[in-house]
């Protein structure tokens, strides 16, 4: 998939960069695999905002995606590549030989008409799902299960993949996209290859309105608010924060505070922690 740029006909097209969607072949989703989904708009069951800057946007239908790949030994043909408004990755529509249809995350390099299969005896080819014990060392995988039978939970976004580093006993060491090296049970399933549509990371919305179409509302800096609205607010002119470091709207430390529990039981499965990003690379802003 290529990147498309625009001439500066308007201020919104000056910096607009989008993907050309040449890989997408289906115009409408499979009716049997879509359901209506109530949009929470960042609210919980009491109507209280728990996630700010959410709301509005275009209407969506949720595509039911098969993250388990549990139809073992039944071959399927790739019928189409569809767009999914709920994620950056595209979806591949599979037609199984027993008549069932399912969506999966479209791996990079997949082709229409290609045959895919899942199971411990599946060939080592892109798009096939196998247990980690049957995948060779050094292979790139995605949609990795954290617990057997629960479905893929890791390496699912566009362009992401994990690498099989080592095998020892009942566990397999995986290098995750965050550079963390973690042990996973050998019976957990993963899909060979990396997730497609990797060029989406090079896109630029170009204008604020396109972000509103995606259901994202404006982010207002705390330093320009009143003191009753944010701990950073108040003062005359462009006043400093007045604290030792930035905090959230609720007074908790922000931008760099570790949030993982020290005594979390799964810490023993983490062989190497992820590389911490700096504030500059993280794109930190005055929350």
UniProtKB/Swiss-Prot annotation:
InterPro entries xref list: NA-bd_OB-fold, Rib_uL2_dom2, Ribosomal_uL2, Ribosomal_uL2_bac/org-type, Ribosomal_uL2_C, Ribosomal_uL2_CS, Ribosomal_uL2_dom3, Ribosomal_uL2_RNA-bd_dom
Gene Ontology biological process: translation
Disordered: region residues: 221-287
Top-rank taxon, per record: Bacteria
Annotated Basic residues bias: 258-287
GO molecular function: rRNA binding; structural constituent of ribosome; transferase activity
PROSITE patterns membership: RIBOSOMAL_L2 (PS00467)
Alphabetically ordered keywords of this record: Ribonucleoprotein, Ribosomal protein, RNA-binding, rRNA-binding
Gene Ontology cellular component annotations, sorted alphabetically: large ribosomal subunit
UniProt xrefs under Pfam families: Ribosomal_L2 (PF00181), Ribosomal_L2_C (PF03947)
HAMAP family: Ribosomal_uL2_B
Protein's job: One of the primary rRNA binding proteins. Required for association of the 30S and 50S subunits to form the 70S ribosome, for tRNA binding and peptide bond formation. It has been suggested to have peptidyltransferase activity; this is somewhat controversial. Makes several contacts with the 16S rRNA in the 70S ribosome.
NCBIfam families to which the protein is assigned, alphabetical: rplB_bact (TIGR01171)
PANTHER family for the chain: LARGE RIBOSOMAL SUBUNIT PROTEIN UL2M (PTHR13691:SF5), RIBOSOMAL PROTEIN L2 (PTHR13691)
Subunit organization: Part of the 50S ribosomal subunit. Forms a bridge to the 30S subunit in the 70S ribosome.
Family that this chain belongs to: Belongs to the universal ribosomal protein uL2 family.
Protein name listed in UniProt: Large ribosomal subunit protein uL2
Organism annotation: Prochlorococcus marinus (strain MIT 9313)
Native organism taxonomy: Bacteria, Bacillati, Cyanobacteriota, Cyanophyceae, Synechococcales
Recorded name of the encoding gene: rplB
């Amino acid at each position: 998939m290529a990147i498309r740029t625009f001439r500066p006909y308007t201020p919104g097209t000056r910096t607009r960069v989008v993907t050309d969607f040449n890989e997408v072949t289906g115009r409408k989703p499979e009716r049997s695999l879509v359901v209506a989904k109530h949009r929470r708009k960042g609210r919980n069951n009491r109507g209280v905002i728990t996630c700010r800057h959410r709301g509005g946007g275009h209407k969506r239908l949720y595509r039911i995606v098969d993250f388990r790949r549990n139809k073992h030994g039944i071959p399927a043909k790739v019928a189409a590549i569809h767009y999914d408004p709920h994620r950056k990755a595209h979806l591949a529509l599979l037609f199984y030989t027993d008549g069932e249809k399912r969506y999966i995350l479209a791996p990079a390099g997949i082709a229409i008409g290609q045959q895919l299969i899942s199971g411990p005896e599946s060939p080592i080819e892109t798009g096939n799902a196998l247990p980690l014990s049957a995948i060779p060392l050094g292979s790139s995988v995605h949609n990795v299960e954290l617990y057997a039978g629960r479905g893929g939970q890791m390496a699912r976004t566009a362009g992401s993949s994990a690498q099989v580093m080592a095998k020892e006993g009942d566990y397999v060491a995986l290098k995750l996209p965050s550079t963390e090296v973690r042990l996973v049970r050998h019976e957990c399933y993963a899909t060979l290859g990396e997730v497609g549509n990797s060029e989406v990371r090079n896109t630029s919305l170009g204008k604020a309105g396109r972000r509103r179409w995606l259901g994202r509302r404006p982010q207002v800096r705390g330093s320009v608010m009143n003191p009753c609205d944010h701990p950073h607010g108040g003062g005359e002119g462009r006043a400093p924060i007045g604290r030792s470091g930035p905090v959230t709207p609720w007074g908790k430390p922000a931008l760099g505070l570790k949030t993982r529990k020290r005594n979390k039981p799964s810490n023993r499965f983490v062989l190497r922690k992820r590389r911490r990003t700096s504030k500059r690379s993280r794109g930190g802003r005055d929350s």
